Each structure stands twice: as C-alpha cells, then as structure tokens.
Amino acid sequence: MSPKTETKASVGFKAGVKDYRLTYYTPEYQTKDTDILAAFRVTPQPGVPAEEAGAAVAAESSTGTWTTVWTDGLTSLDRYKGRCYDIEPVPGEENQFIAYVAYPLDLFEEGSVTNLFTSIVGNVFGFKALRALRLEDLRIPPAYSKTFQGPPHGIQVERDKLNKYGRPLLGCTIKPKLGLSAKNYGRAVYECLRGGLDFTKDDENVNSQPFMRWRDRFVFCAEAINKAQAETGEIKGHYLNATAGTCEEMIKRAVFARELGVPIVMHDYLTGGFTANTSLAHYCRDNGLLLHIHRAMHAVIDRQRNHGMHFRVLAKALRMSGGDHIHAGTVVGKLEGERDVTLGFVDLLRDDFIEKDRSRGIYFTQDWVSMPGVMPVASGGIHVWHMPALTEIFGDDSVLQFGGGTLGHPWGNAPGAVANRVALEACVQARNEGRDLAREGNEVIREASKWSPELAAACEIWKEIKFEFDVIDRL
C-alpha cells in the first residue's frame, strides 16, 4: 500500500493510506489473560507480505479501515485495536501461514456470540488482499465466557433428569424426514422409544410444512412419549424442532412443548442464528427444558480447508450461546470427520479445561471454568456394526443416533431400536469387563446377536455397508 503516512497528534492530522503492519503488526506484544485470541489460516494474494496480510486481518476485524481518518485522534487505538502478534508458516504450503491475533475484551458486547462473530469473522473474509482466510480456533478468556449462561442444563443435570447413567444415550431421527402425516410420525416415534431408544428426533428441516403442521406433530409425539414411558418404565424424549421463521414463533413452539410436559426441544442454531439460539437457551433453562442443537449449514462454513471457519470454533460458540446436545460427526459414518480432529472439539464441548494440542487442532488452552458441558451427538450413516467403535471413540457422555440404522431394520422400527439397544448394552458390558472394543468389537456384536434375533437381522442386512471416502479436513 502507498504512500505511507502516519497520524500523530503533535503534528496534526495527515490524510492518506498507510501499511497496516505499521500499526497492527506487533510481534513484541505480550498477550493478556483477558484477550480473546484467534488463529487464522491466511492465504495472501501474490506479492502481499505475510506481516502485511496478518496485520490487515487484525485491522479489518477490529478498529482499522482502508485510510487514515481524523477521528482516530478522538480515541486510543492502542487500547482497542486488534494485534497480529505472531506468524508461523503452514508446513507443506508455499504461500500460507497461521496469523495469531489478540483482541482486547472491550471490543465485544458481553454475552453476545452475534457481536463476537460480527467483528472477528465479518467483512475481513471478503478482503481483496487475501486469496483465502480461515478461522482455525479461538481462545475465549474466563472474563468473557462468564458473561454467557452457556448450556441450559449440561451433561450431569441431563443425566439426573433422565435417571440414566454409565452408558451413551441412544437416539433415532425419524425417516423419511419429510412427507409423513403427524399421526404416522408419532407412531414411528412410539415404536422406536418402545423398542429401547432414549430419544427420537425431528430432522433439521422438519418445521411446520403443509403435510405436517408443528402443533399436530408436537401433540402426537407427546402422546407417543407418554405411552412408551408407561410401557417401559424409562424416561423418554423426542427432539421437537422449535426452529421457526421468527424468534417469537420459535418461543411460542417451545412454550407449547413445555405445556405438553415433554423433556426436550430442538433448534437449528446456524440457520436459526445465534441471537435466536441464545434466546431459546435462556427460555429452556428457565423452564426446565433440555435443548438439542442441530448444525445444519455447518459444512458451508467449515468444509473447505483454506477458507471459512473450523467447526471447533462453531462448537465453542454453541457452548457459549447454549445447547445441551450438538451434532459432532461420527468419524465412522457418512459425514465428514477425522478422528483426532473430531475428538479435539468433542473435548472442547464436554470438558472444563482443555490443553493446547496442535496434533488435534487445538491452538489454545481453553478454560471454561464452571460453564456446563455439551453432549456430542454422533449421527449420520451409522448402524449396529459401528456400535463398538462409537462407544470406544465417544465414551459415555454422548448420544449415538441411528436414523436409517433403526428404521431401516427389515422387521420394522421397534426391532430396529431393540437391535441398537442390545448392541449398545453388549459393548458397554464388554468395555466394563476390560475388553478392547477397537480390536474385539465385531466379535462382541456377533456374540450378542446369538441371543437377539433383532440384532442378528440388523447385522445381516448392514454387514456390507461402508462409507469409505478420504477426509477433506486434515491437520
């Protein structure tokens, strides 16, 4: 950029354009405990130096603009500006690097993911000096995270509400996702819950369409839950999708769900938006509802390796905005997810304190202090043969969700649920006895299928089903 000019109060205002690195590249800066830290993967245009590109990211996501303005003299840029404090090359990439940026806490509204993202991943992603830009990770300091309510209830409170301990929870998305009448939909919910599942689920795009209005679906699903609970003696639930075109309509649906006495509602947090999601999370805590979160649209944001935002950032944002469950990939199913990377953001969802670990894509140590954890949901192209791997990978504090892997059972919905419950109980028992599920998992399933005809039928129909594609998002 040229020409270069500097604005100094002692000599008055000088108009013009200056290099961002003169103000926003500060390698000597020592980060503060209260700073929000960001790691950006930067691919600059040819000829743009790394220091200038990193400084441009810091400037355009905080106080900077393209030219010197006289109102700079009315405030303290040193207090409010973002700072690119470190740059490191990306191994194996010729013109790409990680730029570390520190933001002072005063730049952000308390308790607002919306404001946080508007600044950090706003206009800067369209900046012409950059060919591509990806936000890899954020460090949220306790001074900021404590301004958020976080999940409505969290993992331990959910287990206490359900009275279910020592194993993953089992779920199922009702299929076909669109086209069923409310009564037939409720029938499928009942059959799956009666067969042994803990939860059933609205698919993400089930809202209130002409073939099934939301109120009818809520009523028939509540009836199915009550009937299944009475027959099994277990607490059951169905994720009633409250996502709507307006926040007011969304809250109206959540209120009706509470009046029906169901334990959980659902929200599509990316398509619905963070403001709506935080509002719903507050309502759920105040009214005793669990909140299941679907991440529909995430791959538009996080799938490309060089541009967008990694899902670990969206996961952290969800923990602050509020949700008791969130879909997190499967590692073994039909949806994207490398094992180490997936387990990295699963820990960021569940644990209180997570150490920096670049081998898992965790760029910063994260301390959530007392914020409740979020239960990861494994869903998408999974079936009974995946149960040992899922149990071993995700552990007890997770939801394993089989849609087609339940309703695709050759004998019907209830036998499909039975097959999954038997497979899960067998895997948990084998693990508790000290068996290695990673090595002996298939044998555990075969042994269990000898005394469960439902599981045997499921094993037979899905024995050849695999989703073997290369993972796009690698470290």
UniProtKB/Swiss-Prot annotation:
Biological processes annotated in GO: photorespiration; reductive pentose-phosphate cycle
Reaction(s) the record says it catalyses: 2 (2R)-3-phosphoglycerate + 2 H(+) = D-ribulose 1,5-bisphosphate + CO2 + H2O; D-ribulose 1,5-bisphosphate + O2 = 2-phosphoglycolate + (2R)-3-phosphoglycerate + 2 H(+)
Keyword field contains Magnesium: yes
The keyword Calcium is annotated on this UniProt entry: no
Coiled coil: none
Site location (Transition state stabilizer): 334
Domain of life: Eukaryota
E.C. number: 4.1.1.39
Any single Pfam family the record assigns to this protein: RuBisCO_large_N
Chain sites annotated for binding Mg(2+): 201, 203-204
Compartments, record wording: Plastid, Chloroplast
PTM remark: The disulfide bond which can form in the large chain dimeric partners within the hexadecamer appears to be associated with oxidative stress and protein turnover.
Enzyme active site: 175 (proton acceptor), 294 (proton acceptor)
Record note on quaternary structure: Heterohexadecamer of 8 large chains and 8 small chains; disulfide-linked. The disulfide link is formed within the large subunit homodimers.
PANTHER family reported for this sequence: RIBULOSE BISPHOSPHATE CARBOXYLASE, RIBULOSE BISPHOSPHATE CARBOXYLASE LARGE CHAIN
Known role: RuBisCO catalyzes two reactions: the carboxylation of D-ribulose 1,5-bisphosphate, the primary event in carbon dioxide fixation, as well as the oxidative fragmentation of the pentose substrate in the photorespiration process. Both reactions occur simultaneously and in competition at the same active site.
The protein, known as: Ribulose bisphosphate carboxylase large chain
